[in-house]
Amino acid sequence: MGKWSGLGLGLLLLVLAGCGAPPLERDEWKVIPTGLSDKADLLDIAFVDDKNGWAVGSRSTLLRTADGGESWTAVPVKLDSDSRFLSVSFDGKNGWIGGEPKRLLRTVNGGASWTSITLDQRLPGSPLKVYALGADTAEVVLNSGLVIKTVNGGKNWQVVTPASAGGIRSAERVADGSYWVVSTRGGSYLQWKPGDPQWTNYERTSSRRIQAMGFSSGKAGWMINQGGEMQFTANQGETWTPGRSVILNGLSLLDADYTAADKKIWAAGGGGTLIVSADDGQNWKAEEVPGIKGSLLNVEFIGNKGFVLGQNGVLLKYRGAAD
């Protein structure tokens, strides 16, 4: 089915999900053409500066923008095999791309050229998330639950975490250098802080398995569980609210992110679902994006910009400042 089956269902959803949030303008997002085939999914996005940015995805997809995300151009990359690029990160002109199978690319010139970095085959797993942390420094989270780090541009790597977190499905690095990850089956989530002798494991508090989790630049955080359920924290994960279903259309949520200053949180998922809360998840409103039927996979607010990435090359851009 489409995102919502008409205005009546949309209004019903708003009533059921709770009222009281500020009215949602129907044009808060716009569709940006990417020219991608129906088989390519967009999975992550990052910017070099205010104008220049990169988006990555399946089928070795690499897109570049030079106008702040208003238009995108595909950039061919020569690889020995097709790759699924899962993550991209920049610190100035220094950037990294990570993905499957065991794929890692590096640039030192804002993406004008990319170099393939070979990882030791003895390292278990493939890059799930990459974090550019300086001219030659980066950290990479492997889907086996290990975090590795380089300080010389990828020539050498050291294992940062004392042990593996086990297979993981999502990972988030916060400002103090600690990591939060979700186990592959979603039965638990784990935290590691620099200096900790091991990962700290937390069992889920909901009967529903965890899909993903993330944090704002402050102490606010979100957790998505199966079936469109969400939980929230205001103290960087020390405590979480009880699970609460925020969508009632039978579709799952897959990702979320806070706007600047944590004033709103947007969540996205299956069937083009895109919802927003301005009161810490108590009430939600739905954004209708005509023609979007596939899953929306990633929500990213970067400075004053916002983007949603999805299946079949879908790319949405937030209208106006992400306040």
UniProtKB/Swiss-Prot annotation:
Reading the lineage from the top rank, the first entry is Bacteria
Residues with a covalently attached lipid (S-diacylglycerol cysteine): C19
Q: How does it sit in the membrane?
A: Lipid-anchor
- What are the recorded Gene Ontology BP terms? photosynthesis
Q: Which UniProt keywords apply?
A: Cell inner membrane, Cell membrane, Lipoprotein, Membrane, Palmitate, Photosynthesis, Photosystem II, Signal
Quick check: keyword Lipoprotein in the entry? Answer: yes
Q: Entry's SUPFAM superfamilies?
A: Oligoxyloglucan reducing end-specific cellobiohydrolase (SSF110296)
Protein location: Cell inner membrane
Show the InterPro entries listed in the entry.
PSII_CF48-like_dom, WD40/YVTN_repeat-like_dom_sf, Ycf48/Hcf136
Q: Which GO terms describe its cellular component?
A: photosystem II; plasma membrane
Q: Which Gene3D superfamilies match?
A: YVTN repeat-like/Quinoprotein amine dehydrogenase (2.130.10.10)
Show which residues constitute the signal peptide.
1-18
Can you state the subunit structure given in the record?
Answer: Part of early PSII assembly complexes which includes D1 (psbA) and PsbI; not found in mature PSII. Binds to the periplasmic side of PSII complexes. Interacts with YidC.
Task performed by this protein: A factor required for optimal assembly of photosystem II (PSII), acting in the early stages of PSII assembly. Also plays a role in replacement of photodamaged D1 (psbA). Assists YidC in synthesis of chlorophyll-binding proteins.
Q: Which HAMAP family match?
A: Ycf48
Annotated domain remarks? A 7-bladed beta-propeller torus, about 55 by 55 Angstroms, with a depth of about 25 Angstroms and a central pore.
Protein name from the UniProt record: Photosystem II assembly lipoprotein Ycf48
Q: Upper taxonomic classification of the species?
A: Bacteria, Bacillati, Cyanobacteriota, Cyanophyceae, Gloeobacterales
